[in-house]
Amino acid sequence: MDYSLETTAEDPWVRISDCIKNLFSPIMSENHNHVPLQPDAPLGEEDGMRGHPDGAAAKLDTTGGGPKAYKQAGGSTVKKGPPVAPKPAWFRQSLKGLRNRVPDSRREMAASCQPTPTSRERPGPPLRASSSIKQRISSFETFSSAHPPDRGAQRLSLQASSSSGEAAELPRKQEGERASGPSGQGAPPTMEQQRPEPEQLPPASPATSEASNPGVSGHPPLEQQPGQKTLSSDPDPLSRLLATQMEGPRGPVVKMPSQRARSFPLSRTQSCEMKPLDEKTSKLYSISSQVSSAVMKSLLCLPSSLSFGQIPCSPKEGVLPPTAFSEDPTNSSAEASASDTSFSLNLSELREYTEGLSESTEANDCDHCTSQPGQSVISLLSTEELKKLIEEVKVLDEATLKQLDSIHVTILHKEEGAGLGFSLAGGADLENKVITVHRVFPNGLASQEGTIQKGNEVLSINGKSLKGATHNDALAILRQAREPRQAVIVTRRPTLEATTDLNSSTDSSGSASVTSDVSIESAEATVCTVTLEKTSAGLGFSLEGGKGSLHGDKPLTVNRIFKGLASEQSDTVQPGDEIVHLAGTAMQGLTRFEAWNIIKALPDGPVTIVLRRKSLQSKGTPAAGDP
């Protein structure tokens, strides 16, 4: 075609438009269709040349004659040059720069795009789109970074305009911010902060839970995006936020264990000081739980090697025979395990030692010989705990001091996860309100040590008092004692003196008084032999008591006699009679369930039973025809 008729002076522009057509991609050609700029702005002219290679559309975008120009471009078969004046030399130089280095044009575009929003004068949809783009660009330059916010910024730009060129322009502006001069609003510090940001902020990822969705527009969500690897150029508020987030990676990792570590010592010190128990329970529970807690806390503070080696060597300790504590380092593992089983002491010995210690710390050599288990426990306690213990002992009255003779502190050394060797019975929610030892397992630690017996009242386990605890709570405390390598159990043996003295201070006098009554009346009991006829209904009476009953270990006795029993049999068997032998089988030490199994296994016919009948009936037991 001949271009010389109309565009002889415009031939360079035709060639320039061809260059522009080759240089720019379709995305760049569609990039600024919705962004009207001033005709004197170089970027607007450049954008017009980009968007329309024929040159006519660039002029008509600024003058508002778009429909007419497009009709000319589509209807004519001859390309016409734009009806504009020749462009200055600097514009051609910029085009040459575009050929040589394409990223520089992007930087100039980002730099020249900043002052353009102030020169907009045309209303309408393009103006609204351009104003929204300006807000997005300013917020993008202020708060965004290279990786995740690109998606959120592209979503924001796509909501404002459907042009794909606007979504592609935002990452290019981010690249142009590094080379932008004074026209870039805080771009250099932003990019400087974005460099170390991927290394600093990923540990602060816990803050992402507080950040909102990145697709929501507005400044508050963008201010919360520093947790999502974003950072602001404003150094005052967000630098402090960054400082708190930099402490964040160690905060959550260290904070949670520290909270747990704080909770356990607080619970131990509370049980050691016994402030709640001093108000609600007796002084006896206070002193026993204090000793248990202090000893357990001291054992946990010792290393495992020292706790296994130091404790058995410091005693000569109490209940176990002296052969169990061999100090020969070449002893066998069996002897070492025997030495690690346990040791026990009486609180009365500990009281005597603390009284002597309050007068003179190095005196009382005779006590050193007689109460070596007490010394081993005292050596475990810190000075503060020992002072508290001495103060508690001084406050106790004589009646309470006598009760210390029946209280024993047992320290069991075991493996992690191993049981203590006994079970519990009773609870505040059961008929028997007192927590007692239900059963001592034959091969357990408690059986090997020998201090803990069936029927003993359990005052505390590892510093946790069982006063007023329900049965499930007591079992939970017993299960928790499996984890440590040591266990401290404070028990009390019911005695005759303890039953009368503890009646006012504790609620456990019931089981102790019953046991003491049995011991007194057993001396005055008479033994008799009777023969009963066993039928399909049994022997005609029910049983109560037995090993591991609700009231502790008690002998098997006749509870009540069923109706329909022969008169001669009802006279021979009375409620409260203790069954000693049944068909040649000893009934001592059996549970009620085991005794019933023996009775059920008997064939029908005559059965010989040896009974022990008390001449003085217990309180509350009817005397049905004493002989």
UniProtKB/Swiss-Prot annotation:
| Protein name per the record | Pro-interleukin-16
Its gene? IL16
List the PROSITE patterns.
PDZ
Which species does the entry assign this protein to?
Bos taurus (Bovine)
One Pfam family this sequence matches: PDZ
**In this protein, which residues make up the domain named PDZ?**
408-493, 529-614
Per the record, where are the segments of Basic and acidic residues compositional bias? 169-178
Keyword set, alphabetical order:
Chemotaxis, Cytokine, Cytoplasm, Nucleus, Repeat, Secreted, Transcription, Transcription regulation
Q: How does it assemble?
A: Homotetramer. Pro-interleukin-16 interacts (via PDZ 2 domain) with PPP1R12A, PPP1R12B and PPP1R12C. Pro-interleukin-16 interacts with GRIN2A. Pro-interleukin-16 interacts with GABPB1. Pro-interleukin-16 interacts (via PDZ 3 domain) with HDAC3.
Q: Give the protein's function.
A: Interleukin-16 stimulates a migratory response in CD4+ lymphocytes, monocytes, and eosinophils. Primes CD4+ T-cells for IL-2 and IL-15 responsiveness. Also induces T-lymphocyte expression of interleukin 2 receptor. Ligand for CD4. Pro-interleukin-16 is involved in cell cycle progression in T-cells. Appears to be involved in transcriptional regulation of SKP2 and is probably part of a transcriptional repression complex on the core promoter of the SKP2 gene. May act as a scaffold for GABPB1 (the DNA-binding subunit the GABP transcription factor complex) and HDAC3 thus maintaining transcriptional repression and blocking cell cycle progression in resting T-cells.
